[in-house]
Every structure is written in structure tokens, then in C-alpha cells.
Amino acid sequence: MKTFSAKAHEVTREWYVIDATDKVLGRVASEVARRLRGKHKPEFTPHVDTGDFIIIINASKLKVTGNKTLDKKYYRHSGYPGGIYETTFGKMQERFPGRALEKAVKGMLPKGPLGYAMIKKLKVYAEATHPHSAQQPKALEI
């Protein structure tokens, strides 16, 4: 019996919509990363993008446990000496709802061209509406 290897052109991709209202950031991110990668499918192949498209709505209503709203920090650097910027989870959710979720999922995906292709299949929206109704996404409960 030969080992099965998925081909990129043979992969069928589904569209799923997840409502992130009152869900915990890490639990949503880990399940989304798993599905973007395609690990939930029996035809999963590590070097082929076999994952599905994921739409996340209500990302502004995402929660974190404990005191992480104030304590969890995100860092970025301008490239200049002394140019480090620090933002808390709460401030990031106010200014850019959904960016914390995107960063969490991106950190859980492979680095390199395959991971960059996987993160493009993630669509995050702060409100309850999304422009992907033509794809007829199925509701996914986490």
C-alpha cells in the first residue's frame, strides 16, 4: 500500500464562519490554525495547503482569561534605535479589533511560503456582517 500524498489541485476547500462572541482568544486561535492547516482532514499532507477558508465575525467581542486584558503586551519595532512600541491587548482590541486574533493564529502556523498562503485564507471581521455570503459558509461552533 502506497502512502497517500494530497495534490494541491485536488484539494476541496470549504468555507466556515465562526462567531467569536464571548469566546477565549487562544481556544479560537488554536482551532482556526488547525483548520487553516487542514489537520482535521484525513488527506492532510504537511507540505501541501489542504486547509479550509475561515471567516470570523464579532472579533471585537473576543475575551481573554484572567488579567490579560491589561497584562498581555504586544511589541513592534520601527527599526530605529529606541523605536520599540508596546500595546496591551485591551488597547489593541479598541483600536484594531481582530488584530490580536490574527497575530495569535499567525504565530501558530508554519513560517515560510506555505504558512503565508494559509494565513490568507483567514478573514476576520469586527462586526456580525461579512461580505462572503456568496461562498455559503457553514457555521462552525467552537
From Swiss-Prot:
Its job: This protein is one of the early assembly proteins of the 50S ribosomal subunit, although it is not seen to bind rRNA by itself. It is important during the early stages of 50S assembly.
Family: Belongs to the universal ribosomal protein uL13 family.
GO cellular component: cytosolic large ribosomal subunit
Gene that this polypeptide is encoded by: rplM
Gene3D superfamilies cross-referenced by the UniProt entry: Ribosomal protein L13
NCBIfam families from the UniProt entry: rplM_bact
Protein name: Large ribosomal subunit protein uL13
Keywords: Ribonucleoprotein, Ribosomal protein
GO BP: negative regulation of translation; translation
Subunit description: Part of the 50S ribosomal subunit.
One matching Pfam family: Ribosomal_L13
Domain of life: Bacteria
PANTHER family found in the cross-reference section: LARGE RIBOSOMAL SUBUNIT PROTEIN UL13M (PTHR11545:SF2), RIBOSOMAL PROTEIN L13 (PTHR11545)
Origin species: Burkholderia vietnamiensis (strain G4 / LMG 22486) (Burkholderia cepacia (strain R1808))
Molecular function terms, GO-annotated: mRNA binding; structural constituent of ribosome
